[in-house]
Amino acid sequence: FPTDSTQWSDMDGDGYGDNPTGNNADLWTNDSSQWFDSDGDGYGDNPTGTNGDAFPNDGTQWSDQDGDGFGDNPNGTNPDAFPNDATQWSDSDGDGYGDNRNGNNGDRFPNDGTQWSDQDNDGYGDNQAGNNPDAFPAEGTQWSDTDGDGYGDNQGGKEADRFPNDNTQWSDIDGDGYGDNANGNN
C-alpha cells in the first residue's frame, strides 16, 4: 500500500489491508472473497463470497436460501415464513399455507386461519371444522345444506333442495308444492 501509511500487509491479496485500525481494513484477512461487513452481522458484504450476506444493509438478515428476497431469519426484518419455497414468503393467518394463492400450497383464505382450500372456487372453504365451510366442496354451484339432507340450498345450483328447511323432502318434480318422498313430511 504505497499511498496508505495505515496499511502495509494484505495476506489474502484482495486489495484490503490486514491492519484492523487502518484505512480500508479487511475483516477477513484469510479470505479473499470477503473484506467488509456494513451491517455488522458477521457476514461479508460480498453476497457471492464465503458466508456472503444476501442483505448487506440489514443486520437482522443475511441468508435467503430460496432467493425470493425475504430473509430466512424468522426474528429478523421481513422474515420468510417459507425459507425453502420461492413461491411463498408470508402466512398472515398462521395456518401454514402461504398468502400467495398462485404459489405452492397457496391459501385461498389468507386472513382466515381456519380455511385455506376451496377446490370448487365458490368462495366457501373446504375445511368442515373451519369458518363458513362448504357443504359441497367439489360442487361449485352449492355450498350450504340447511336441513342436512344432502341437497344444496341454492335453487339455481345442481341438485337443488326444493325444501331447504325439511330434511325429509328435497324434490318436487311436478311442482305442486308437495315433496316427492312418500315417506317424508307433507
Residue ranges, per PLM feature:
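Extracellular calcium-associated, cysteine-rich motifs in secreted modular proteins
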Residues: 1-186
